[in-house]
UniProtKB/Swiss-Prot annotation:
UniProtKB keywords: Acetylation, Cytoplasm, Lipid metabolism, NAD, Oxidoreductase
InterPro entries hit by this protein: Ald_DH/histidinol_DH (IPR016161), Ald_DH_C (IPR016163), Ald_DH_CS_CYS (IPR016160), Ald_DH_N (IPR016162), Aldehyde_DH_dom (IPR015590)
Name of the protein: Retinaldehyde dehydrogenase 3
EC code(s) of this entry: 1.2.1.36
Pathway: Cofactor metabolism; retinol metabolism
Compartments in which it is found: Cytoplasm
UniProt record similarity statement: Belongs to the aldehyde dehydrogenase family.
Active site as annotated: 280 (proton acceptor), 314 (nucleophile)
Predominant place of localization: cytoplasm
Broadest EC class assigned to this enzyme: oxidoreductase
Source organism of this protein record: Rattus norvegicus (Rat)
Length: 512
């Protein structure tokens, strides 16, 4: 998905990236209804909600608004699809994998359409939607397609005349709630392993960005997944999200979003039926640059690490700790990078930064920028909205940041780079870990012993060394502390979507 310096791996057989196509500027949105049982439904309430283009603030279309009765209907469909003897349950594991591969094929076919929809709905650059989000989505479905017929139990030796073995069985109906910053990619992270293991799914996309999920529903139907296997209910968190989290017939839920909402999801899951929960939440991610680092690499990776996707990443390098010997030079080069970052129309192939997702997020970022100024951080560049451009914010760099400032403590989720100074490893380890979060961390050094010491000491689910945002479908991802529970991606994700059953059979005689 991303290489060591933030560039994109395309995964083409010949190693050459596909050419960036032209976005479909006047794309007609075809799919806006609730998707249940491989069919399109209007909500029982009859309500709709609008989705807007953050670049222009213009309404894209209206989407059917689900509520609890629609979730109930979706769960009934998912339950029926999971019943013993159903077409989905009778399907062999190899065929499940083939369906996932075929879905990836259709995503490849419609890649430009999906990237266009993602850019319209989120405001992210088309360049990134096409090469990062869609590439990661395709690779995720293909990776888990390969796992479908390789999920195996074990034979267990015992001290009695029995045969003992384990089976890894699907959990049943799984709920999924996806965020607005990577709508399609996070959908793939949840849907692919769930289907690989033989589960059925009821999914709620973020209300700000429902369009790619609904388009994907059309591809799921086209591929030939049995009715009820995948159901998508657009709507709002307090209604659809709450109904999924608390539904007694949903056996597992996966959520990506804020820590505050994650707590509500986990509470609802425990109050209802103790459903299993996977949470991928917020982070205040340290990026540690040692004096012996390759400074060119460190500056570029830290820049991409915080400004990519308009800073709207749970993995953003939101606390950059730089050793005092190279602090001044690092700040100087970081400011140069920020001033050169192309901000503008996300459909322009040269644009690397688009608008923030909505007015609420835009206002929050500007308020935190003002707090940085008031609390004594040095504003090196940016620090305000782009003139006459709606929800666009200038790439912002602060130096002389201290740990007690709000821009160092709170999740900004915007294009703001706070740069802090440190003197030695023990100091920076303590400061880096002095947070309730533990999602990711990064280390830049040429010293292997130093890298391994920091990788061991940092309280984060992922530690990148001399790279940033290096995601691979094969590598598990998740957080420590209040950054979440469980793991997505990799073989570890399969455990989140299966139950282990132990079978013990009494024998007349124990075989050697």
């Amino acid at each position: 998905m991303a290489t060591a310096n933030g560039a994109v791996e395309n995964g083409q057989p010949d190693g050459k990236p596909p050419a960036l196509p032209r976005p479909i500027r006047n794309l007609e949105v075809k799919f806006t209804k609730i998707f249940i049982n491989n069919d399109w439904h209007e909500p029982k309430s009859g309500r709709k909600f609008a989705t807007y283009n953050p670049s222009t603030l213009e309404k894209i279309c209206e989407v059917e608004e689900g509520d609890k009765p629609d979730v109930d209907k979706a769960v009934e469909a998912a339950q029926a699809a999971f019943q013993r003897g159903s077409p989905w349950r009778r399907l062999d594991a190899l065929s499940r994998g083939q369906l996932l591969h075929q879905l990836a094929d259709l995503i490849e076919r419609d890649r430009a359409i999906l990237a266009t929809l993602e850019t319209m709905d989120t405001g992210k650059p088309f360049l990134h939607a096409f090469f990062v989000d869609l590439e990661g989505c395709i690779k995720t479905f293909r990776y888990f397609a390969g796992w479908a017929d390789k999920i195996q139990g074990r034979t267990i030796p015992t001290d009695d005349n029995v045969m003992c073995f384990t089976r890894h069985e699907p959990i049943g109906v799984c709920g999924a709630i996806t965020p607005w910053n990577f709508p399609l990619l996070m959908l793939a992270w949840k849907l692919a392993p769930a289907l690989c293991c033989g589960n059925t799914v009821v999914l709620k996309p973020a209300e700000q960005t429902p369009l790619t999920a609904l388009y994907l529903a059309s591809l799921i139907k086209e591929v030939g997944f049995p009715p009820g296997v995948v159901n998508i209910v657009p709507g709002f968190g307090p209604t659809v999200g709450a109904a999924i989290s608390s539904h007694p017939q949903i056996n597992k839920i996966a959520f990506t979003g804020s820590t505050e909402v994650g707590k509500l999801v986990k509470e609802a899951a425990s109050r209802s039926n103790l459903k299993r929960v996977t949470l991928e939440l917020g982070g205040r991610n340290p990026c540690i640059v040692c004096a012996d680092a390759d400074l060119d690499l460190a500056v570029e990776c830290a820049h991409q690490g915080v400004f990519f996707n308009q800073g709207q990443c749970c993995t953003a390098a939101s606390r950059v700790f730089v050793e005092e010997q190279v602090y001044g030079e690092f700040v100087r080069r970081s400011v140069e990078f920020a001033k050169k970052r192309p901000v503008g129309d996300p459909f322009d192939a040269k644009t690397e930064q688009g608008p923030q997702i909505d007015q609420k997020q835009f206002d929050k970022i500007l308020e935190l920028i003002e707090s940085g100024k008031k609390e004594g951080a040095k504003l090196e560049c940016g620090g305000s909205a782009m003139e006459d451009r709606g929800l666009f914010i200038k790439p912002t760099v602060f130096s002389d940041v201290t740990d007690n400032m709000r821009i160092a403590k709170e999740e900004i989720f915007g294009p703001v780079q706070p740069i802090l100074k440190f003197k030695n490893l023990e100091e920076v380890i303590k400061r880096a870990n002095s947070t309730d979060y533990g999602l990711t961390a990064a280390v830049f050094t040429k010293n292997l012993d130093k890298a391994l010491k920091l990788a061991s000491a940092l309280e984060s689910g992922t530690v990148w060394v001399n790279c940033y945002n290096a995601f691979y479908a094969q590598a598990p991802f998740g957080g420590f502390k209040m950054s979440g529970n469980g793991r997505e991606l990799g073989e570890y994700a399969l455990a989140e979507y299966t139950e282990v059953k132990t079978v013990t059979i009494k024998l007349d005689e124990k075989n050697p």
